[in-house]
Amino acid sequence: MPEQPLPTLPMWRVDHIEPSPTMLALRANGPIHNVRFPRGHEGWWVTGYDEAKAVLSDAAFRPAGMPPAAFTPDCVILGSPGWLVSHEGGEHARLRTIVAPAFSDRRVKLLAQQVEAIAAQLFETLAAQPQPADLRRHLSFPLPAMVISALMGVLYEDHAFFAGLSDEVMTHQHESGPRSASRLAWEELRAYIRGKMRDKRQDPGDNLLTDLLAAVDRGEATEEEAIGLAAGMLVAGHESTVAQIEFGLLAMLRHPQQRERLVGNPSLVDKAVEEILRMYPPGAGWDGIMRYPRTDVTIAGVHIPAESKVLVGLPATSFDPRHFEDPEIFDIGRDAKPHLAFSYGPHYCIGMALARLELKVVFGSIFQRFPALRLAVAPEELKLRKEIITGGFEEFPVLW
């Protein structure tokens, strides 16, 4: 009997956001699977919730930004000073501790009114456009950039500039060569941040750049590490939230009964955001976080050779019935159980409180401001950004 070919990634979502039937079928057969990656490498895909947590918290695995030599891509951001996923252990903890105060509950609460004001401003900008209008251009793309401007302590007017650079870095991150679009954008972004940090010497404040300067002055980080930390927070904090707003809106438009529940009971917004994060997180078809075991390991009875590719399929874990009851049902009243949309372990998303705030502000008010909000095209006509791991859309045309 001929050997069956390995399941191959990516496994594209149905209608851009619904889980892949192939992924669901694989997940039903166990928590870990031998798969083939897009460039032909064999590896492993972890789809079980408990198994994913175990891998993500186990120091026996290298983080995504520290791959073995056989898998090192020509990626401009990997290995860059201050890029958190390219550090582990004590070095990672040192760098993460420096930026943690900027994302503390206290700092995020202080930003709440600003986020609400930014969203209200963008709603009015959208409302002033001729219909149909591109919601991506007027809301989902600028909002996270304007929020990160406030967090970093730079001018709102700069948001379009650095959001564009962030987009270039992520869209072209695997292009090679010293003059690649990604490398040029990354260098320009770092130069921009370097200049803004100089400005903060004369005009400090309660913001991330001032925190980073203080860390440099205390000898806790080099200037290049501080610049890299700021650039990393900007890139990571922008692209994923853009996609999450778009996927969440598409989810609510696809589930009108859930939308009506939210409109009728705005107090459900916290649960609605968690359900959107659980079932419709950012991503396209190869969703997850890579890990590399340093030695041979066994996961759920499966032997994994050292230095193999192990993709922790974060979205797939949300459909594990051992953890979530009726996981394929979108229910904004679901009793909350922890999901892995923000990862787990030492490298969990440091900006998750800020991301949650942005999503709660958007989903807590957009359907009040635009009661008849709807897509201007059929969902299948939306163009998914397949070249970027977070997904999202080229445009998001809407009517209201």
UniProtKB/Swiss-Prot annotation:
Which residues does heme bind?
C349
| Task of the protein | Cytochromes P450 are a group of heme-thiolate monooxygenases. They oxidize a variety of structurally unrelated compounds, including steroids, fatty acids, and xenobiotics.
Which InterPro entries would you find in this protein's record? Answer: Cyt_P450 (IPR001128), Cyt_P450_B (IPR002397), Cyt_P450_CS (IPR017972), Cyt_P450_sf (IPR036396)
Statement: the UniProt record of this protein carries the keyword Metal-binding: yes
Q: Which family does it belong to?
A: Belongs to the cytochrome P450 family.
Which Gene Ontology molecular function entries are recorded, alphabetically?
heme binding; iron ion binding; monooxygenase activity; oxidoreductase activity, acting on paired donors, with incorporation or reduction of molecular oxygen
- Keywords for this protein: Heme, Iron, Metal-binding, Monooxygenase, Oxidoreductase, Plasmid
List where the protein spans the membrane: none
EC number in record: 1.14.14.-
Per its UniProt entry, what is the enzyme's top EC class, as one word?
oxidoreductase
Q: What is this protein called?
A: Cytochrome P450 BJ-1 homolog
* Source organism of this protein record: Sinorhizobium fredii (strain NBRC 101917 / NGR234)
